[in-house]
């Protein structure tokens, strides 16, 4: 009888141990699930910001008369991350065909002007 009580106690301890391990595993997985949700939310916000900036750049290009066709990134189509290097050469080719220079080059050319001319409003 004492041996049965001992076996019952061991079985009970084994169940408790398994329950604690399961609970511990679930507790460690919860923060990762929350972290994943936060990461997805942040990535969605980054994509929305990217699309907004892209739309502003397209509108700016149309306003300046550079081109009505601007390169579109695969990131806006399929939600994947692309590097700046992937889009920059396209922009360079697009601008070279119109005779326009990217704004960074214009800013460098303006540095050589006299101080009485404004960089924002260059003299013709």
Curated annotation (Swiss-Prot):
Task: Give the organism, scientific name.
Answer: Bos taurus (Bovine)
**Spans annotated as Disordered:** 1-31, 59-124
Q: Which Pfam families match?
A: DUF4681
Q: In what ranges is there compositional bias, type Polar residues?
A: 65-86, 98-124
This one is known as Uncharacterized protein C12orf54 homolog
InterPro entries named among the record's database cross-references: DUF4681
């Amino acid at each position: 009888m004492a041996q049965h009580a001992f076996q019952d106690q061991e079985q009970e301890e084994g169940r408790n141990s398994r329950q604690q391990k399961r609970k511990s595993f679930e507790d460690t997985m919860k923060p990762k699930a929350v972290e994943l949700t936060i990461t997805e939310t942040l990535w969605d916000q980054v994509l929305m910001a990217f699309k907004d900036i892209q739309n502003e750049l397209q509108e700016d290009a149309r306003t300046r008369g550079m081109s009505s066709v601007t390169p579109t990134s695969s990131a806006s189509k399929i939600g994947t991350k692309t590097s700046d290097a992937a889009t920059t050469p396209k922009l360079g080719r697009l601008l070279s065909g119109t005779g326009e220079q990217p704004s960074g080059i214009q800013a460098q050319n303006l540095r050589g002007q006299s101080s009485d001319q404004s960089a924002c409003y260059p003299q013709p």
